[in-house]
Amino acid sequence: SLLLLGLGRVILGIGQSFAGTGSTLWGVGVVGSLHIGRVISWNGIVTYGAMAMGAPLGVLCYAWGGLQGLALTVMGVALLAILLALPRPSVKANKGKPLPFRAVLGRVWLYGMALALASAGFGVIATFITLFYDAKGWDGAAFALTLFSVAFVGTRLLFPNGINRLGGLNVAMICFGVEIIGLLLVGTAAMPWMAKIGVLLTGMGFSLVFPALGVVAVKAVPPQNQGAALATYTVFMDMSLGVTGPLAGLVMTWAGVPVIYLAAAGLVAMALLLTWRLKKRPPSALPEAASSS
């Protein structure tokens, strides 16, 4: 029934949230907080890689065994993940009194806002690039999405140590600049190749935004609160992607599809200004966080 389907989606969302945050912090506990940027980057690579493979594999499973076969396959994959995780040594929890949620939110919300603003570019590419190509009368929207994915994953693979070398806020500002150029190219594209270059640059720019800001956000709290900080920080991206679609749809019906990419570039520019302010006047936090900027 619809009720069971909705309940299943809620449970799936809760489980996915714990799995994503927990696995990231597990990795940080294994390799140390110095490499938190690389851990977040690799977590994103395997997550988006699984999503990319999941769609075609899901179609094959559905064709082979129907909806029940698909459900059993997904449960089998989840069970395999549990079996692989069980024999691995546990990570010792950090002792100390945890901060209340309000205090954690107060330390990470500015970084979350910058992430939310920058996520608008990702949202309009993923949701509206097909409509954009259709409005222009062009072919190749699927290839444009492929370019975005390749640029996203490729940038993380090519620059694994960039955050440690330059600092999270510096990397974020560079990424914002690249993302802005990409969105402006898409919004003003008169030829398909301009749009494809713009999509490629947007993927490159957005790739390191999450780990770059996440490093600083997580280190703004004591170690025993880093799980709560990462979860809170991630919510800003989820909320941004949730509202980007409807709002961009309203703008599109009023002013046309290209305008939403120009508007997204403006939001990313706001993220750039906010991050520059955080760089010049960092909020009161732990000394470790200030050194990561």
Predicted regions and their residues:
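Paired small-residue
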Residues: 3-11, 193-201
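Cytoplasmic helix-loop-helix junction between adjacent transmembrane helices
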Residues: 8-46
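Helix-loop-helix hairpin linking two adjacent transmembrane segments in secondary transporters
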Residues: 42-86
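Small-residue (Gly/Pro/Ala) motifs that create kinks and tight helix-helix packing interfaces
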Residues: 50-62, 130, 244-252
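Structural signature of the two symmetry-related core transmembrane helices
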Residues: 75, 170-185
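C-terminal membrane-cytosol helix-exit motif in multi-pass small-molecule transporters
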Residues: 75-93, 274-279
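Extracytoplasmic gate region of multi-pass secondary transporters
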Residues: 110-145
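Helix-to-loop junctions at the C-terminal end of transmembrane segments
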Residues: 155-168, 252-253
